[in-house]
Regions:
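Compositionally biased, low-complexity linear motifs
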Residues: 4-6, 117-122, 165, 242-256
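Conserved two-metal-ion catalytic palm core of "right-hand" nucleic acid polymerases
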Residues: 1-115, 124, 137, 141, ...
């Protein structure tokens, strides 16, 4: 089979794939035990979704607000942390007050009709639209949390909100981390008016609702006056940044569990190294030295992950080839390129 024929066959397979039957998985997240409904994609669906996102990235990234973070390459929580630290330490006048808010049941509430209408205005390829609509319709309401396409579609859906806040409301410092948002300002009344305008925009333009627990408060200053900002897993003060307590507790519990095992698993190693990435970029070394360092050897964990990763790409390649050939494709004459994309900042 020629390369052109193989590519054509692969495209036909992607365009004509059908959604699998899904059983929702319920997880209870964080110390608040918040219930989340996850739709776990099959290997076939995951492969198709990655192909779609790779093709659609130019559209998703065009016009994206520069301080929109989460689930985007190079835009994890650590990058957002650096930006907020720069704002609060170099421009204290415009960071006197904070408006903190998020969207109620964001993924579960995105209206299909509005999302599809927005896609129709931008995409003129009927096959791509049909494929995207098929994925969106996996759930009757909202978009499926757990699908690779969902994080890109949801970020893209809120682009208009980002530009409304920055350009029409003239927010000096504004950041969005998926559906969590913060706006810094010098005037409390102005932030309250912004909050109302944002709430109206969400309802009228996007069919979404601002959660009722929004806050406007005086940011940390002087000798323990004002409040710290809890955002993206960090707690920001005027002169330091520490980890959110819940994340630090998870890290210490994981370290203690590993210390009681004869041998750490690869999942243990990855999770603990992810926590180390968070600890390294915050002012929490004393807590790390007291509670975590005595329990685990990070050098051993790094070696374990390194050894595993040497064989991981080969296993993924073989699985993709098996899936492709099982669907009627020919593996000979076709080279599958497997590229690992991950951001340590998004591991929590």
């Amino acid at each position: 089979m020629s390369d052109d024929a193989a590519v054509e066959q692969s495209l036909d397979w992607i365009v004509n794939y059908e959604n699998a039957e899904h059983v929702p998985v319920y997880i209870y997240d964080g110390i608040t035990r918040k219930e989340r409904t996850i739709i776990v994609p099959t290997m076939e669906e995951l492969l198709v979704q990655h192909c779609i996102v790779n093709a659609m990235k130019p559209m998703f990234c065009k016009g994206m607000y520069e301080h929109s973070y989460a689930s985007l390459p190079g835009r994890g929580a650590h990058k957002g942390k650096q930006v907020i630290e720069k704002w609060i330490r170099t421009d204290p006048k415009n960071c006197k007050y904070v408006l903190k808010m998020d969207i109620r049941h964001f993924f579960d509430s995105i209206p299909h009709d509005r999302l599809k209408a927005k896609l129709k205005k931008t995409i003129h390829d009927e096959k791509m639209l049909e494929l995207l609509f098929r994925i969106i319709d996996v759930t009757e309401v909202g978009i499926p949390l757990g699908f690779y396409t969902s994080q890109w579609l949801s970020n893209w859906y809120l682009q208009g909100l980002d530009h409304f806040i920055k350009e029409q409301l003239c927010a000096v410092h504004y950041m969005r981390y998926m559906d969590d948002m913060v706006v810094f300002g010098s005037n409390k009344r102005v932030l309250h008016r912004m909050r109302q305008a944002i709430s109206d925009y969400l309802e009228i333009e996007l069919g979404l609702e601002l959660k009722a627990n929004w806050q406007v408060f005086r940011f940390s200053y002087g000798n323990n006056q004002g409040r710290d900002l809890d955002f993206m897993g960090f707690r920001f003060y005027r002169n330091r940044t520490i980890l959110r307590k819940s994340i630090m507790h998870k890290a210490t519990r994981k370290a203690r569990k590993i210390s009681k095992k004869e041998k750490a698993t690869i999942l243990d190693a990855r999770q603990m190294l992810s926590y180390l990435g968070w600890i390294d970029c915050t002012d929490t070394y004393l807590m790390y030295r007291k509670w975590i360092k005595p329990c685990v050897s990070f050098q051993q964990l790094k070696r374990k992950v390194s050894r595993y990763d040497k064989h991981d790409e080969k296993r993924v390649y073989q699985k993709l080839v098996s899936l492709y050939t099982a669907k009627g494709g020919k593996s000979h004459g076709v080279e599958l390129q497997v590229r690992r994309e991950h951001s340590p900042a998004d591991c929590i």
